[in-house]
From Swiss-Prot:
InterPro entries: DAGAT (IPR007130)
Its biological purpose: Catalyzes the terminal and only committed step in triacylglycerol synthesis by using diacylglycerol and fatty acyl CoA as substrates. Required for storage lipid synthesis.
Record-level GO cellular component terms: endoplasmic reticulum membrane
Source organism of the structure: Umbelopsis ramanniana (Oleaginous fungus)
Annotated protein name in UniProt: Diacylglycerol O-acyltransferase 2B
Keyword Signal: no
Keywords tagged on the record: Acyltransferase, Endoplasmic reticulum, Glycerol metabolism, Lipid biosynthesis, Lipid metabolism, Membrane, Transferase, Transmembrane, Transmembrane helix
């Protein structure tokens, strides 16, 4: 049976369609370069870090940095944002590659704090990065006074150099301590959580929006505990930039992905898109418009005096209101930005 599945996988590998070496506009080459830079940033940082160890003069500095890396709690306490890095021209090229567009449904009061919940996860949440880790789509202009922190796995902040670059973009750990530290650090401080997580990425396919949301109550508990309003976000096109190989439940691929997720806490979707010199083989995403709609804030109930945790009833009431708002966003824009959909948005878990 497994041999049949492997054969089917090999048969699914596409014939390569090569891109022309000439006649491509400079702006498109710059856009592709920006995407490649971001995708290659992790191995580049690790290679630089290891290469520096070949220079004995730098050993004392590198040893101190490596020790400091394990004790540095910045990723859990708001990070080290550098506005100039978020505003680099590189990110404009990154966003224009697809392109990514940000649509604002309502104002956010800079005196409040917000948990911005992003859907769908996609393969690697490209639009979440473009919108909330950079200023490529003008987030700060549309939401003055709101300071967003895109959250990711804590394990990413154990990687030398790469961790520091991510923090310069305002990115932080998705741990509970990190979330609460950011939300309590002052008015306007907000977090962006890709709510579906690794499980949802395994369902990311063009023309579909299968969400893992029914059992996700952690972000709602967090909002009520900290008095932060919830902001639903939906990106049309996030699932359309990669083709994912068939990984239906019980298949060889599915079992490997679940095993890997259990061991590491994250998973690796087996997907492909295009390459630098071809249009259909590689891990550079397809060019496809991504339109991110930021919904109106949803106020959450306040905890009664002496209470430290919300009740199950409170969380389920807020969840129902949240799903209703998210559905309203999808229904409002689906015939504009998801005309070629195979099916409508579905809550699969």
């Amino acid at each position: 049976m497994e041999q049949v599945q492997v054969t089917a996988l090999l048969d699914h590998i596409p014939k390569v369609h090569w891109a022309p070496l000439r006649g491509i506009p400079l702006k498109r080459r710059l856009q592709t370069s920006a995407i490649v830079t971001w995708l290659a940033l992790l191995p580049i940082c690790l290679i630089i870090y290891l290469y520096l160890f070949t220079i004995p003069l730098l050993w004392p500095i590198l040893i101190m940095y490596t020790i400091w890396l394990f004790f540095d709690k910045a990723p859990e306490n708001g990070g080290r944002r550098i506005s100039l890095v978020r505003k680099l021209p590189l990110w404009k090229h990154f966003a224009n590659y697809f392109p990514v567009t940000l649509i604002k449904e309502g104002d956010l009061d800079p005196k409040g704090n917000y948990i911005m919940s992003y859907h769908p996860h996609g393969i690697i949440s490209m639009a979440a990065f473009a919108n909330f880790a950079t200023e490529a789509t003008g987030f700060s202009e549309q939401y003055p006074g709101i300071v967003p922190s895109l959250l990711t796995l804590a394990s990413n902040f154990r990687l030398p150099l790469y961790r520091d670059f991510m923090m310069s973009l305002g990115m932080c750990s998705v741990s509970r301590h990190s979330c609460e530290a950011i939300l309590r650090s002052g008015p306007g401080r907000s977090i962006v959580i890709v709510t579906g997580g690794a499980s949802e990425s395994l369902s990311a396919r063009p023309g579909t929006n299968d969400l893992t949301l029914k059992k996700r109550l952690g972000f709602i508990r967090l909002a009520i505990r900290n008095g932060a309003s919830l902001v639903p976000i939906f990106s049309f096109g996030e699932n359309d930039i990669y083709e994912q190989y068939d990984n239906k439940k019980g298949s060889l691929i599915w079992r490997y992905q679940k095993w890997f997720q259990k061991i590491t806490g994250f998973t690796v979707p087996l997907a492909h898109a295009r390459g630098i010199f071809n249009y259909n083989a590689g891990f550079i995403p397809f060019r496809h418009p991504i339109v991110t709609v930021v919904g109106k804030p949803i106020a959450v109930p306040l905890l009664a005096e002496g209470e430290t945790e919300p009740s199950e009833e409170q969380m389920h009431q807020v969840q129902a209101q949240y799903i209703e708002s998210l559905q309203a966003i999808y229904d409002k824009y689906k015939d504009i930005y998801a005309k070629d959909r195979i099916k409508d948005m579905t809550m699969i878990a």
